[in-house]
From Swiss-Prot:
Region called Disordered, residue ranges: 63-86, 409-429
UniProt organism field: Chlamydomonas reinhardtii (Chlamydomonas smithii)
Main location: plastid
Record-given protein name: Cytochrome c biogenesis protein CCS1, chloroplastic
InterPro entries, sorted: Cyt_c_bgen_Ccs1/CcsB/ResB (IPR023494), ResB-like_domain (IPR007816)
Keyword Membrane among record annotations: yes
Designated gene of the protein: CCS1
Keyword Chloroplast: yes
More info: Algae lacking CCS1 are unable to grow phototrophically; they specifically accumulate apocytochrome c6 and apocytochrome f. A mutant with a small stroma insert (ccs1-ac206) does not produce holocytochromes.
Amino acid sequence: MQPYASVSGRCLSRPDALHVIPFGRPLQAIAGRRFVRCFAKGGQPGDKKKLNVTDKLRLGNTPPTLDVLKAPRPTDAPSAIDDAPSTSGLGLGGGVASPRTLVQSNAVQVAWRRLMKELSSLPRAIAIMALIAVLSGLGTFIPQNKSIEYYLVNYPDGAEKVLGFLTGDLILTLQLDHIYTADYFYLSMGLLAASLAACTYTRQWPAVKVAQRWRFLTQPKSLLKQGRTEVLPNARVSDLGAILLQRGYQVFVKDGSLYGFKGLAGKLGPIGVHAALLLCLFGTAWSGFGTLKGNVMCPEGQDFQVASFLQPSSPIASMPASASNVIHVNKFTIDYRPDGSVAQFYSDLSLLDPAQGGKEMMRKTISVNDPFRFNGVTMYQTDWSLSAVTLRVLGQDAPLARAAQAAEAQAAASTSGPTSSASSTSDALPQQRTAFNLPMASLEGKPGVAGRLWATFLPLAEPGQDGSAPKGISILARDPQSVVFYDAKGQFVGVRRPGSGKPIEVEGLALVVEDVTGATGLELKSDPGVPAVYAGFGGLMVTTLISYLSHSQVWALQQGSSLFVSGRTNRAKLAFDRELDDILNAVPELPPTAATTVASSASTAAPAPTAKQ
């Protein structure tokens, strides 16, 4: 068997160490091994002469001499080599990997590299961030999560279009009424997360791995390529290393070569920034899919269960364990400014545990911007309302008073037995028992009503059989400070303050406003993504500062009595130049006799192996 060429000047006659690839097929890598192309006898790699035969060899981990076999011409008959069992240890099922498999594997690798390159592109990442910023701006301009009627009324079609094109139908079609939970918003965040991950994997992390290597330079010309280079006559590399250690450098010395660096955290900073941004994106997505929200208007003195008002934003949202607790509204109060407008409103709330018989677990008075947080649920003070008005009727002869007395007498007679008389019970009724608690309803948004207004009605007679409205007193209030009375004809009668004790005569009745019961408007929210978002923003601030740290490197090479020193940095280059000047000025200059000793020792020292650059 005659070889066509030799590799490294040696040849082998081991046909089992060779995989023959059919002529004309592209050169591929099998199982990560390297291939070498050998040419026919007399040919050189630079020759332009077209070769008829191409031999491809598989090299092992050691440099043995290899036989070069002539590749057979492709034929229609199956090759005996293809059917022969493999002895190469590749573990490919007893045969050589087919060219089709190699091409498919290479195509996947090429596609993966192209995908990573596209995702890690800085212009594309900026474009995705700009898209998210535009969508967020639209979400700020267009009110979110309102009713369909709201958008149809406030963004009408026709000549009154907002901005000339924005209509309610367009907003609903493009999901602009809930941008932050729209499909395209989540898709944009997913693309940004993929771009950050690809950039970290393909660019930032390899840069950190390179920065961690000890890179010794053994030739003066290698130092010249690193940037600024200085030559110190009569100097020792050990003295330079000691000074660098004092300056906070990590120093490594080997056979007259020195490598020192500091500020490696600056290389890790961009990775931390990307990780913090990914954490923010994850928290945002988790909030979108896992949030539970709800609103409740609870009157003073009443309670409600948290789980009854929490609505999940998606099927994967889970109810927190604290949702089974009960909230009791102890007191609701409002502070007013001197002009009578509302300054602040407060709700005194108690958290009760039904599993422990309604035991009070927590209690807090909340207000606007001071929420109530408990076990993953946050309760905000967002609104208020008027729930009821309590009136007292003066005089035992008033019809309403007599009706109330009769009802009390009937209840007392049914509980005290047959010997009790209604008259005696009626005589014992105190005057303050003839009181009425009338519920109030909001008239806000009704025709002819401006602002917030609550109303109730005190009937004085049964409704007529003809369907006519019953005779009664209309009672209105805009806030808990004052109550307005109108008679049966709709004529204004007067205004009274709750708790003043001053009666007002309406339709022959003397009425006293005892109290106006308020209702607190609370927004309930359980957002599991908030901790991740806060942690991401905190990490983003810290890692952004870290990324501004300079990564500085210094190389030195002892050549006789001369010391070659080079250095570079990625930031604050002027400051690094000044620092390097101070370091070089601090290196002591040796006397001639000591310099001669250093030169002789350097000349007898073994040459240092060249490190991988």
